[in-house]
Protein backbone atom coordinates (compact mmCIF):
# COMPACT_ATOMS: atom_id res chain seq x y z
CA UNK A 1 0.00 0.00 0.00
CA UNK A 2 1.20 3.50 -0.78
CA UNK A 3 1.81 5.68 2.26
CA UNK A 4 -0.41 8.43 0.88
CA UNK A 5 -3.29 5.97 1.20
CA UNK A 6 -2.13 5.04 4.70
CA UNK A 7 -2.26 8.67 5.81
CA UNK A 8 -5.65 9.12 4.15
CA UNK A 9 -7.05 6.12 6.00
CA UNK A 10 -5.29 6.88 9.28
CA UNK A 11 -4.04 10.49 9.57
CA UNK A 12 -2.37 9.84 12.93
CA UNK A 13 -0.01 7.06 11.90
CA UNK A 14 3.10 5.72 13.60
CA UNK A 15 6.20 4.95 11.57
CA UNK A 16 9.89 4.37 12.22
CA UNK A 17 13.12 5.10 10.39
CA UNK A 18 15.96 2.61 10.62
CA UNK A 19 19.57 2.54 9.43
CA UNK A 20 21.05 -0.64 7.92
CA UNK A 21 23.89 -1.88 10.12
CA UNK A 22 27.34 -1.04 8.79
CA UNK A 23 28.96 -4.23 10.06
CA UNK A 24 27.98 -7.55 8.55
CA UNK A 25 27.99 -9.24 11.95
CA UNK A 26 25.37 -6.76 13.19
CA UNK A 27 23.01 -7.62 10.34
CA UNK A 28 21.94 -10.81 12.11
CA UNK A 29 20.40 -8.66 14.85
CA UNK A 30 18.05 -6.88 12.44
CA UNK A 31 15.20 -9.31 13.12
CA UNK A 32 15.36 -8.66 16.85
CA UNK A 33 15.10 -4.92 16.23
CA UNK A 34 12.28 -5.28 13.71
CA UNK A 35 10.31 -7.49 16.07
CA UNK A 36 10.54 -4.83 18.77
CA UNK A 37 9.47 -2.08 16.38
CA UNK A 38 6.66 -4.10 14.83
CA UNK A 39 5.24 -4.86 18.28
CA UNK A 40 4.34 -1.14 18.27
CA UNK A 41 2.22 -1.71 15.15
CA UNK A 42 3.74 0.91 12.85
CA UNK A 43 1.99 1.69 9.59
CA UNK A 44 5.32 1.78 7.75
CA UNK A 45 9.08 1.67 8.32
CA UNK A 46 11.55 3.65 6.24
CA UNK A 47 15.05 2.36 5.55
CA UNK A 48 17.93 4.73 4.85
CA UNK A 49 20.20 4.52 1.82
CA UNK A 50 23.89 5.35 1.56
CA UNK A 51 25.69 7.84 -0.62
CA UNK A 52 27.35 6.59 -3.80
CA UNK A 53 29.53 3.55 -3.31
CA UNK A 54 27.99 2.58 0.02
CA UNK A 55 27.92 -1.16 0.57
CA UNK A 56 24.76 -0.68 2.65
CA UNK A 57 22.53 -0.02 -0.35
CA UNK A 58 21.90 -3.70 -1.10
CA UNK A 59 21.13 -4.13 2.60
CA UNK A 60 18.54 -1.36 2.32
CA UNK A 61 16.54 -3.33 -0.23
CA UNK A 62 17.08 -6.60 1.64
CA UNK A 63 15.75 -5.07 4.86
CA UNK A 64 12.82 -3.48 3.02
CA UNK A 65 11.91 -6.90 1.59
CA UNK A 66 12.03 -8.40 5.08
CA UNK A 67 9.81 -5.64 6.49
CA UNK A 68 7.21 -6.20 3.78
CA UNK A 69 7.23 -9.97 3.45
CA UNK A 70 8.11 -11.17 6.95
CA UNK A 71 6.48 -8.50 9.09
CA UNK A 72 3.66 -7.39 6.78
CA UNK A 73 4.52 -3.71 7.24
CA UNK A 74 4.92 -1.30 4.35
CA UNK A 75 8.55 -0.27 3.73
CA UNK A 76 9.68 3.12 2.46
CA UNK A 77 13.07 3.01 0.76
CA UNK A 78 15.27 6.09 0.89
CA UNK A 79 16.87 6.73 -2.50
CA UNK A 80 19.69 9.23 -2.95
CA UNK A 81 20.84 10.56 -6.30
CA UNK A 82 23.87 12.86 -6.11
CA UNK A 83 26.38 10.08 -6.79
CA UNK A 84 24.26 8.05 -9.21
CA UNK A 85 23.39 8.36 -12.89
CA UNK A 86 20.08 7.67 -14.59
CA UNK A 87 20.96 4.08 -15.48
CA UNK A 88 21.78 3.30 -11.84
CA UNK A 89 18.55 4.89 -10.62
CA UNK A 90 16.66 2.86 -13.24
CA UNK A 91 18.22 -0.30 -11.82
CA UNK A 92 17.22 0.62 -8.26
CA UNK A 93 13.62 1.33 -9.26
CA UNK A 94 13.49 -1.94 -11.22
CA UNK A 95 14.62 -3.82 -8.11
CA UNK A 96 12.00 -2.07 -5.99
CA UNK A 97 9.29 -2.81 -8.54
CA UNK A 98 10.31 -6.48 -8.71
CA UNK A 99 10.07 -6.76 -4.92
CA UNK A 100 6.67 -5.06 -4.82
CA UNK A 101 7.98 -2.05 -2.89
CA UNK A 102 5.80 0.96 -3.69
CA UNK A 103 7.19 3.79 -1.58
CA UNK A 104 10.31 5.91 -2.13
CA UNK A 105 11.72 8.82 -0.17
CA UNK A 106 13.67 10.68 -2.86
CA UNK A 107 16.71 12.56 -1.55
CA UNK A 108 19.73 14.33 -2.95
CA UNK A 109 21.93 12.67 -0.35
CA UNK A 110 24.98 13.88 1.52
CA UNK A 111 28.12 14.64 -0.42
CA UNK A 112 30.64 11.80 -0.26
CA UNK A 113 34.26 13.00 -0.50
CA UNK A 114 35.31 9.53 -1.66
CA UNK A 115 32.77 9.36 -4.50
CA UNK A 116 32.47 12.24 -6.97
CA UNK A 117 29.03 13.62 -7.70
CA UNK A 118 27.60 12.83 -11.11
CA UNK A 119 25.80 15.25 -13.40
CA UNK A 120 22.40 13.61 -13.89
CA UNK A 121 20.85 14.71 -10.59
CA UNK A 122 21.93 17.77 -8.65
CA UNK A 123 18.81 18.17 -6.51
CA UNK A 124 16.17 15.92 -4.99
CA UNK A 125 13.59 17.58 -7.24
CA UNK A 126 15.54 16.27 -10.26
CA UNK A 127 15.28 12.72 -8.91
CA UNK A 128 11.59 13.07 -8.09
CA UNK A 129 10.77 14.30 -11.59
CA UNK A 130 12.86 11.56 -13.21
CA UNK A 131 11.21 8.75 -11.24
CA UNK A 132 7.79 10.23 -11.96
CA UNK A 133 8.55 10.58 -15.67
CA UNK A 134 9.97 7.07 -16.03
CA UNK A 135 7.64 5.08 -13.77
CA UNK A 136 4.39 7.05 -13.77
CA UNK A 137 2.21 6.26 -10.78
CA UNK A 138 4.02 3.03 -9.92
CA UNK A 139 5.59 4.54 -6.80
CA UNK A 140 4.45 6.90 -4.09
CA UNK A 141 7.28 9.43 -4.00
CA UNK A 142 7.92 11.36 -0.80
CA UNK A 143 10.27 14.29 -0.34
CA UNK A 144 12.17 15.50 2.70
CA UNK A 145 11.58 18.81 4.44
CA UNK A 146 13.34 20.75 7.19
CA UNK A 147 11.23 22.59 9.80
CA UNK A 148 14.40 24.32 11.05
CA UNK A 149 15.36 25.24 7.43
CA UNK A 150 17.70 23.20 5.24
CA UNK A 151 21.30 23.92 6.30
CA UNK A 152 22.23 24.90 2.73
CA UNK A 153 19.24 27.21 2.16
CA UNK A 154 19.87 30.97 2.09
CA UNK A 155 16.81 31.64 4.26
CA UNK A 156 13.29 30.38 4.99
CA UNK A 157 11.86 31.80 1.76
CA UNK A 158 14.56 30.09 -0.30
CA UNK A 159 13.97 26.81 1.53
CA UNK A 160 10.20 26.85 0.96
CA UNK A 161 10.76 27.75 -2.70
CA UNK A 162 13.00 24.71 -3.16
CA UNK A 163 10.50 22.55 -1.31
CA UNK A 164 7.74 23.69 -3.67
CA UNK A 165 9.91 22.47 -6.56
CA UNK A 166 9.87 18.97 -5.07
CA UNK A 167 6.09 18.98 -4.86
CA UNK A 168 5.70 20.41 -8.36
CA UNK A 169 8.05 17.66 -9.60
CA UNK A 170 5.77 14.96 -8.19
CA UNK A 171 6.35 14.52 -4.44
CA UNK A 172 3.05 13.33 -2.95
CA UNK A 173 3.91 13.97 0.68
CA UNK A 174 6.75 15.40 2.74
CA UNK A 175 8.53 13.66 5.61
CA UNK A 176 10.22 16.10 7.95
CA UNK A 177 13.70 16.05 9.37
CA UNK A 178 13.84 15.88 13.15
CA UNK A 179 12.89 18.91 15.24
CA UNK A 180 12.64 19.52 18.98
CA UNK A 181 10.12 22.38 19.19
CA UNK A 182 6.53 21.68 18.18
CA UNK A 183 5.88 25.34 17.39
CA UNK A 184 8.71 25.22 14.86
CA UNK A 185 6.89 22.45 13.03
CA UNK A 186 3.47 24.08 13.24
CA UNK A 187 4.83 27.35 11.86
CA UNK A 188 6.67 25.50 9.12
CA UNK A 189 3.55 23.57 8.10
CA UNK A 190 1.62 26.85 7.90
CA UNK A 191 4.36 28.40 5.75
CA UNK A 192 4.04 25.44 3.41
CA UNK A 193 0.30 25.94 3.07
CA UNK A 194 0.73 29.66 2.37
CA UNK A 195 3.23 28.77 -0.38
CA UNK A 196 0.71 26.47 -2.05
CA UNK A 197 2.24 23.24 -0.80
CA UNK A 198 -0.89 21.18 -0.22
CA UNK A 199 0.50 17.68 0.23
CA UNK A 200 0.66 16.08 3.70
CA UNK A 201 3.61 17.22 5.84
CA UNK A 202 4.54 14.43 8.25
CA UNK A 203 6.53 15.31 11.40
CA UNK A 204 9.75 13.44 12.19
CA UNK A 205 10.59 13.01 15.86
CA UNK A 206 13.81 11.80 17.46
CA UNK A 207 13.65 10.89 21.18
CA UNK A 208 16.32 12.54 23.29
CA UNK A 209 17.91 9.29 24.52
CA UNK A 210 21.45 9.21 23.10
CA UNK A 211 23.65 12.25 23.64
CA UNK A 212 26.25 11.50 20.96
CA UNK A 213 23.65 10.56 18.36
CA UNK A 214 21.62 13.70 19.01
CA UNK A 215 24.66 15.94 18.71
CA UNK A 216 25.63 14.27 15.44
CA UNK A 217 22.15 14.65 13.96
CA UNK A 218 21.74 18.24 15.12
CA UNK A 219 25.07 19.14 13.54
CA UNK A 220 24.26 17.29 10.33
CA UNK A 221 20.77 18.66 9.70
CA UNK A 222 20.98 22.06 11.38
CA UNK A 223 18.10 21.46 13.80
CA UNK A 224 17.80 23.81 16.75
CA UNK A 225 18.30 22.08 20.09
CA UNK A 226 16.29 23.95 22.78
CA UNK A 227 17.84 24.76 26.11
CA UNK A 228 15.48 22.48 28.03
CA UNK A 229 16.79 19.50 26.05
CA UNK A 230 20.38 20.66 26.42
CA UNK A 231 19.85 20.59 30.19
CA UNK A 232 18.51 17.03 30.02
CA UNK A 233 21.55 15.86 28.06
CA UNK A 234 23.95 17.76 30.34
CA UNK A 235 22.37 16.31 33.47
CA UNK A 236 21.85 12.71 32.36
CA UNK A 237 24.25 12.30 29.43
CA UNK A 238 26.58 9.96 31.33
CA UNK A 239 23.76 7.72 32.52
CA UNK A 240 22.06 5.92 29.62
CA UNK A 241 19.13 4.62 31.66
CA UNK A 242 18.42 8.01 33.24
CA UNK A 243 18.75 9.81 29.90
CA UNK A 244 16.34 7.35 28.31
CA UNK A 245 13.75 7.95 31.04
CA UNK A 246 14.15 11.72 30.94
CA UNK A 247 14.39 11.97 27.16
CA UNK A 248 11.31 9.92 26.47
Describe the predicted segments one by one.
Residues 13-29, 75-87, 142-158, 234-248:
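Active-site mouth loops of central-metabolism enzymes
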Residues 119, 123-146, 194-248:
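Active-site pocket-lining/capping segments in soluble small-molecule metabolic enzymes
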Residues 1-16, 23, 132:
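N-terminal amphipathic alpha-helix/helix-capping segment at the start of soluble metabolic enzymes
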Residues 18-22, 49-53, 75, 81-83, ...:
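Active-site-proximal loop/turn and secondary-structure-junction residues that shape catalytic pockets
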Residues 3-4, 27-35, 40, 52-73:
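Glycine-rich, positively charged N-terminal anion/phosphate-binding segment
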Residues 21, 42-63, 109-119, 172-188:
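Glycine-rich, proline-tolerant flexible connector loops at the mouths of alpha/beta enzymes
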Residues 12-20, 43-47, 75-79, 104-106, ...:
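Hydrophobic faces of well-ordered beta-strands that scaffold small-molecule active sites
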Residues 81-95, 121-123:
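Glycine-rich anion/phosphate-binding loops
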